[in-house]
A protein has these predicted regions:
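Histidine- and acidic-residue-rich, metal-dependent catalytic cores
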Residues: 2-239
Length: 239
């Protein structure tokens, strides 16, 4: 029988990535924060779906492992590379407790494509578009004046982002002052509090997140990826 986790594995993941490359997890935390506050203002999703979407936002770039690709991802370029999305898709699909959302991770930078090699439902595509909106808001505000965000979002309204989602963001911003809290770093305390209050995972879910973390770290080196794969198979055989 599963028992609640003894450690907060989400916090472990955040701390681990912060030591490796703080740029990615800081970006993920801000994207997760934007989504978290927006989801407080809707009844479109169940509490479990809201938490799942927060986790997707937090870890949406978990497949990034090359410094050059991280640099590209964190620049404001709408011609995004899919390489990190493919690795993220494989990690979520094969190891994480959110495997049903793997296609969301795969298409979070390409949610307006005309053809999808991996089928994606409208429900998941809407989530991917929402994550991409939060992603672009964060990247834009890191590199530009917040005052210019409105013009940017209007420029892509209807072409990349749903007008209703943009309106949803601005209503949430007016109520919760998301951008100001991100700039002052106050958001970190809210994210940390949310993680500790909502990440009450069962033992099997914790194990899956730890496997996701392990393999994501080892994607950074072909040698370590092969080593970990061999070690996992050997451990399973011994067990």
């Amino acid at each position: 029988m599963n028992r609640p986790q003894l450690i907060n594995v989400v916090d472990v993941i955040c701390r681990s990535f912060r030591h490796l490359d703080p740029r990615l997890i800081s970006h993920g935390e801000r994207v997760g924060y934007i989504l978290m506050k927006m989801l407080e203002e809707t009844r479109r999703y169940t509490p479990q779906e809201k938490h799942d979407i927060f986790m997707l936002g937090l870890l949406h770039d978990i497949g990034a492992y090359k410094d050059s690709e991280i640099d590209t991802m964190l620049s404001f370029d709408t011609d995004d590379s899919m390489e990190h999305s493919v690795f993220g898709y494989l990690l979520f699909k094969n190891f994480s407790p959110l495997s049903q959302y793997a296609d969301v991770v795969l298409y979070h930078h390409n949610c307006n494509a005309q053809y999808y090699s991996v089928p994606i439902s409208n429900y998941h595509r809407d989530i991917a578009k929402l994550i991409y909106l939060a992603d672009r808001i964060d990247i834009f505000c890191v590199q530009n004046m917040e005052e210019d965000l409105y013009t940017f979002l209007e420029q892509y309204s209807g072409r990349i982002f749903y007008p209703a989602d943009i309106h949803w963001f601005w209503n949430t911003q007016e109520k919760h002052h998301i951008l100001e809290k991100m700039k002052s770093l106050e958001y970190r305390e809210e994210v940390s509090d949310y993680i500790f209050r909502h990440s009450n995972l069962m033992a099997d879910q914790t194990h899956k997140y730890l496997r996701t973390l392990t393999f994501s770290l080892d994607f950074r080196s072909e040698y370590t990826a092969l080593h970990t794969d061999y070690a996992v198979h050997l451990s399973n055989n011994i067990a």
